[in-house]
């Protein structure tokens, strides 16, 4: 299954121009790209089936040619001290990453992972145990923000990349 996924186009990682070009290459009109972009980056849907203003026929074309990366929330730990939330997300390839939400008076800040593992070798950090495995796709980084925002039902105002 992983080999099949690698052949599909990761549309959450695309900017608007790239998405427009891709949608046109699939035989659809240009305006569809804007609709799909809004479903992904404004409404934060996790599957093509949630895109209710896209025809079922074109949804199937998308499923045949693209992948919509959506992280799976495995665990959330909440600090009793200050309410900080640590998230563990599973990636499609079986790896896991961590993200952290910190709530402040001025807004919600998240620290997102940019890679699986780390080569720094810090003794206190579990991320370094297996070394650096790989960098994350843009979609995997973006979806950390989207999933945390959906989890708390609030806007994320600041992002720190780890």
Predicted regions: what they are:
Residues 97-114, 119-162:
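Conserved Radical SAM active-site core
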Residues 1-108:
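Flexible, acidic/Gly-rich N-terminal and inter-domain linker regions that tether
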């Amino acid at each position: 299954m992983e080999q099949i996924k690698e052949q599909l186009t990761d549309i959450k990682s695309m900017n608007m121009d790239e998405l427009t070009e891709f949608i046109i290459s699939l035989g659809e009109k240009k305006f569809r790209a804007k609709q799909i972009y809004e479903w992904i980056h404004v409404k934060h849907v996790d599957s093509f089936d949630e895109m209710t203003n896209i025809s079922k026929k074109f949804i199937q074309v998308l499923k045949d040619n693209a992948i919509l990366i959506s992280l799976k929330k495995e665990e959330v730990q909440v600090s009793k001290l200050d309410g900080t939330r640590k998230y563990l997300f599973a990636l499609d390839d079986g790896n896991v990453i961590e993200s952290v939400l910190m709530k402040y008076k001025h807004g919600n800040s998240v620290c997102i992972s940019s890679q699986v593992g780390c080569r720094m070798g810090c003794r206190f950090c579990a991320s370094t145990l297996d070394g650096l495995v790989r960098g994350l796709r843009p979609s995997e980084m973006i979806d950390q923000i989207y999933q945390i925002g959906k989890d708390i039902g609030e806007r994320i105002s600041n992002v720190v990349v780890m």
